[in-house]
């Protein structure tokens, strides 16, 4: 599922990108932008856009749009929002259009529904789930991208990243932002003191956890208050263990959650989740810990943090940046270990979708599909683009360059976050569906069969029937 920072998906599997953060993913994280004047996103601000403007260069021709106005909605906040506004400012500088950023709330489909019902839909929205794109199409809100945007997609994106933005073979989404959700971040000093090394396999991870525990530090921090973190844990184990074909089938509910492959994945997860002393605060504490705190508590307290390791995507760097820890020295990362034959790499992302068709809206999604837009935000940090023509040098540190290189190298060989492909009622609603069922499982990891039954019941209701 998406993160509170970004946010997280195609029909092909990620095996090749297991090298995602191999070796010492080093160097300190460059700060992600600063205070941006929320009231000004027009051309007068664009000359101040760090990393933007003329230095980025131009690879796409945009029309003159003087006198036009556009509204762009997304759930992004903080530095992520401020940095995206700099991208919008560059679009304004080059076209003359006045662009306003509209802060949205999760779930964004509900937010957009209220705006549309009130007769005030934004021109473009950034949607964090393929399921949301499908819903927007089914509700007849979304408009297909035009020839110019399609040309940029064909030139700059792998077929897999194009396909995940399609509904019934028609292109509606332009994936502007990606996430690598197969990473485990760790407190370097805590592992060093325990004499532990970066694990390559699940068995190695269990050994590392025991070494850390024996040294007097709790092994894992889990942000269980946000159910999407638990779906991400499950998806990585399931993809590596059951394989891409089964992953696709479960994502589409073509096999049931009572399938033996789900039992195997839950049983594997229980090897960690059932050990109360392995989780910061135990299961109850984990269920009260939101994602941002699960990261920051891993990197505060020096070599005696509340936990030594925290699982989540590349976007965790933003939260690490809120501590005194430096990425690459105090905070390091390794790929999610192989549970089966190969290590998983699960991806996520946010797609731009047109809600009010116009020359200006089409020009904006064309710009967002170009390297020009992504390069601006890449330079600012805390961002990953699926655009293969964004230069690696645009990323501000070696950690992000390595992750970006692995994402692009995987081409079409990757899998999109499973819960983000599901109907919102099952895969994207706090306190319901998969989020709630896995929270209950974290509380009682011995009840594998009961968890499977609840997951299947909720999935069947959300997908509109059994498999």
Question: Language-model segments: which ranges?
Answer:
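Periplasmic solute-binding protein
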Residues: 136-140, 161-200, 225-250, 346-352, ...
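Extracytoplasmic/periplasmic substrate-recognition and gating elements
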Residues: 89, 312-384
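Hinge/lid segment of periplasmic solute-binding proteins
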Residues: 52-64, 130-182, 332
């Amino acid at each position: 599922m998406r993160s509170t920072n970004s946010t997280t998906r195609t029909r092909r599997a990620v095996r090749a990108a297991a090298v995602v953060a191999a070796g010492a993913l080093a160097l300190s994280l460059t700060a992600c932008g600063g205070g941006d004047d929320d009231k000004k996103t027009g051309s007068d601000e664009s000359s101040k856009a760090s990393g933007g403007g003329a230095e980025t260069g131009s690879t796409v021709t945009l029309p003159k749009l003087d006198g036009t106005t556009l509204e762009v909605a997304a759930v992004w906040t903080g530095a992520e929002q401020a940095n995206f506004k700099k991208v919008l400012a560059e679009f304004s500088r080059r076209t003359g259009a006045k662009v306003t950023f509209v802060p949205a709330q999760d779930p964004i489909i509900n937010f957009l529904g209220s705006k549309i019902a009130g007769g005030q839909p934004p021109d473009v929205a950034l949607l964090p789930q393929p399921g949301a794109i499908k819903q927007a199409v089914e509700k007849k809100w979304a408009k297909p991208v035009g020839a110019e945007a399609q040309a940029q997609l064909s030139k700059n994106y792998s077929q897999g990243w194009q396909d995940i933005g399609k509904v019934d073979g028609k292109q509606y989404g332009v994936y502007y932002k990606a996430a690598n959700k197969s990473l485990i971040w760790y407190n370097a000093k805590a592992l060093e003191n325990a004499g532990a090394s970066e694990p390559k396999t699940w068995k190695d991870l269990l050994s590392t956890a025991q070494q850390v525990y024996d040294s007097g530090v709790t092994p894992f921090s889990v942000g269980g208050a946000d159910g999407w973190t638990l779906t991400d844990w499950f998806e990585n184990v399931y993809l590596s263990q059951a394989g891409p074909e089964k992953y696709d089938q479960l994502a589409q509910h073509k096999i049931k959650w009572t399938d033996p492959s789900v039992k195997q994945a839950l049983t594997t997860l229980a090897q960690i989740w059932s050990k109360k002393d392995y989780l910061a605060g135990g299961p109850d504490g984990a269920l009260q810990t939101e994602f941002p705190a699960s990261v920051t508590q891993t990197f505060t307290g020096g070599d005696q943090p509340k936990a030594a390791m925290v699982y989540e995507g590349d976007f965790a760097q933003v939260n690490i940046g809120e501590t005194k820890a430096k990425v690459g020295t105090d905070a390091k990362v390794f790929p999610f270990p192989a549970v089966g034959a190969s290590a998983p790499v699960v991806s996520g992302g946010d797609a731009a979708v047109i809600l009010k068709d116009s020359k200006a809206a089409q020009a904006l999604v064309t710009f967002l599909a170009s390297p020009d837009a992504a390069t601006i935000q890449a330079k600012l940090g805390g961002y990953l683009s699926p655009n293969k023509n964004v230069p690696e040098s645009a990323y501000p540190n070696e950690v992000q360059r390595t992750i970006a290189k692995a994402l692009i190298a995987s081409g079409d060989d990757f899998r999109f976050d499973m819960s983000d492909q599901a109907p919102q009622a099952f895969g994207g609603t706090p306190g319901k569906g998969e989020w709630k069922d896995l929270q209950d499982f974290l509380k009682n990891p011995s009840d594998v069969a009961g968890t499977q039954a609840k997951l299947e019941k909720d999935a069947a209701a959300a997908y509109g029937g059994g498999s």
